[in-house]
């Protein structure tokens, strides 16, 4: 699979309010007898990004009459592009890797961010699964 299987966005109240975006699909999502006891599950990681709400981000209709304000959909695009890179190049990311983007990582904004650094998620860290280790980067 070249694309991610999905992405979840969580509201976090820890210290300053932020959105926590976590991918799924870079690791084995389902029990696979052929993957049991492998060192790493799938590529061995999932993307995890924490961002503060940005006033210019669009709102999202939750379908139940409620609206989630300022959804960071741009992060999903970044994660999808990184997933495509991994699947196409067969090169994966590990803790403390850096990848230049050669342009701002977020279009149509005045950001100075032109690369992605991979660090362990401070809350999720990593887990051992029946299919191998998964780090949240």
Which residues are covered by each model-predicted region?
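Short linear motifs embedded in intrinsically disordered, proline/glycine-rich low-complexity segments
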Residues: 1-137
């Amino acid at each position: 699979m070249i694309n991610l299987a999905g992405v979840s966005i969580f509201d976090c109240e820890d210290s300053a309010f932020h959105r926590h975006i976590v991918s799924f699909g870079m690791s084995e999502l389902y029990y696979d007898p052929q993957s049991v006891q492998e060192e790493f599950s799938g590529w061995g990681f999932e993307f995890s990004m924490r961002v503060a709400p940005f006033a210019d981000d669009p709102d999202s209709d939750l379908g139940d009459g409620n609206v989630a304000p300022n959804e960071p959909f741009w992060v999903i695009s970044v994660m999808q592009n990184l997933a495509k890179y991994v699947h196409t190049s067969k090169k994966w990311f590990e803790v403390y890797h850096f990848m230049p983007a050669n342009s701002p990582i977020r279009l149509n904004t005045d950001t100075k961010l032109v690369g992605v650094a991979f660090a362990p998620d401070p809350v999720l860290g990593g887990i051992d699964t029946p299919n191998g280790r998964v780090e949240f980067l």
